[in-house]
Amino acid sequence: MTRSPSRQMSLVGFMQAGGSTVYSGSWRHPATEHRFLEQGYYQHLGRVLEAGCFDMMFFDDRLAMPGIYGGSVGPAVELGARPVKLDLSVVLGLIAGVTRSIGLGATYSTTYYSPFHVARTFATLDHLTGGRAAWNVVTSVNDSEAQNCGLATHLDHDARYDRADEFLEATVGLWDTWEDDALVLDRESGRFADPSKVHELDYDGRWFKVRGPLTVPRTPQGRPVLLQAGSSGRGRDFAARWAELIFTGDPGIEVARAHYKDQKDRIAEQGRDPATVKMLPMAYTVLGESRSQAEELERMLLDDLVDPTASLVLLSELMNHDFSGMGLDEPVTDELIESVSGIRGLVQNLRAHIGHDLTLGDLAGHRATLLQGPRFVGTGEEVADQMEEWFSGDACDGFVIAATHSPGAYEEVVRLLVPVLQRRGLFRDRYDGSTLRENLGLPRP
């Protein structure tokens, strides 16, 4: 797969609306600001990333505190293992008011919401941001979420994706119920809209029956941008059908290259152009004014800030499996992977990176020591070298940058790394488009 010399990478900020980033020790970092319950905190993050010309910032979400480990939320609450998760529609509205160009994405579950609710939420966001909305499609991961939404247990892995396919069919159908020129707004004739250009959907599936039409007209982007992060075989097929930006968790470049090729092939098999779908691995950047400073910061992240129990709390949440009674030296077998209903692909990718023999301690270390994606360490020039190797080596189309602390990690990326990427012609120095789709180079449906 050859690349144009003028091709530039995409950069996306991976955000959390709570007290910790995805790195569970981040709240203990000496530079972390504990202002996650203040609107100014999120608005500042939006301004920082927009100043760095990031394509988008999107927020992860879950519908429950981590409570699988030991059958209690106590460890998550005590150790700060992501117990706080604010309502993202409110957070994005606050950021939208102080930014003009950066894309704004939120995570909504196809298992615990309805198509009409999600379609209306993101259509509204797309209008009120001038075409900057994106939906990160997830199927949710565990029983704790089910129990907050009126169910006893979470759907099994494949059933969640069957439901998600119908959810997307209905949601996309609702976005298409208004034609682009349906609004007339003719004061003289008294004609608000053309009823021949507003259509009922009448979706009738196994999981959903949705009449429509949507109560929000066609949006500036036509449809909000769709993100997805499935990495199991079923998840990759789902992404091949629906996703426009695929968020991956590949820990090493060889795993990433294999994933990139496999996913692009699946996209082509769906009759879609692989060039219109971007694959972005989550990456941590540990930046310093010198290599030695960056390595000392990395040592602190690896050795000082993460409680091993917090890692097991988050691992239990992701896998929907209580690991509190297992020893760290116990093997992670094929049978164990098949028995869980949570995120299987994450474990499979890590096993491919480390080797077939994988223990629970390896997985706990994976969550604790920042191995969910690549970890780029060094000066701005050195980190740019590492990112360029991935980007030019058929491993990705850009990166989703996760923070080791906030907001400082993003401030450092914008100050130390982005100018290097811009000088090399690898990243934009201004926004040329007026919508998120235009800035990502994606077609308007």
Ranges and model annotations:
Residues 1-445:
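N-terminal glycine-rich cofactor-binding segment that shapes the pocket for flavin-like pterin cofactors
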